[in-house]
């Protein structure tokens, strides 16, 4: 059986982790053990927060729609119910964009729904 020396493979593996740890503070970017722990934690956080981002943006859109709807004399739940009953198909992201960037169009939608 031939002798296997893992020098190149081990260095590659460590450098891969240390490259992922660039930008971390202190020994977390230089020392392999701590860098490995920090990278694993960072990847866990990234996985979790990719799912959380969807929730956070939906909450932001709803808050923006509600604020603009209240300015126009209704509230969020009545506006969404009116959109459903009048069969206007527009999602919350588009509604929030309209409320923020084009208040006149948003006002027309609210008036069309509240009739």
From Swiss-Prot:
This is Large ribosomal subunit protein bL20. Binds directly to 23S ribosomal RNA and is necessary for the in vitro assembly process of the 50S ribosomal subunit. It is not involved in the protein synthesizing functions of that subunit. NCBIfam families: rplT_bact. Belongs to the bacterial ribosomal protein bL20 family. The gene is rplT. It comes from Prochlorococcus marinus (strain MIT 9515). GO terms for biological process: ribosomal large subunit assembly; translation. Keywords: Ribonucleoprotein, Ribosomal protein, RNA-binding, rRNA-binding. It comes from the Bacteria. InterPro entries: Ribosomal_bL20, RIBOSOMAL_L20_CS, Ribosomal_protein_bL20_C.
């Amino acid at each position: 059986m031939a002798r296997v020396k893992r020098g190149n493979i081990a260095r590659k593996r460590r450098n891969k982790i240390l490259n992922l740890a660039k930008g971390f503070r202190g020994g977390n970017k230089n020392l392999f053990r701590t860098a490995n722990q920090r990278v694993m934690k960072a990847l866990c956080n990234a996985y979790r927060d990719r799912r959380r981002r969807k929730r956070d943006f939906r909450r932001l859109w709803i808050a923006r729609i509600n604020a603009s709807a209240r300015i126009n004399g209704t509230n969020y739940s009545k506006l969404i119910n009116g959109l459903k009953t009048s069969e206007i198909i527009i999602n919350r992201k588009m509604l929030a964009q309209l409320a923020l960037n084009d208040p006149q169009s948003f006002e027309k939608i609210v008036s069309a729904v509240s009739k």
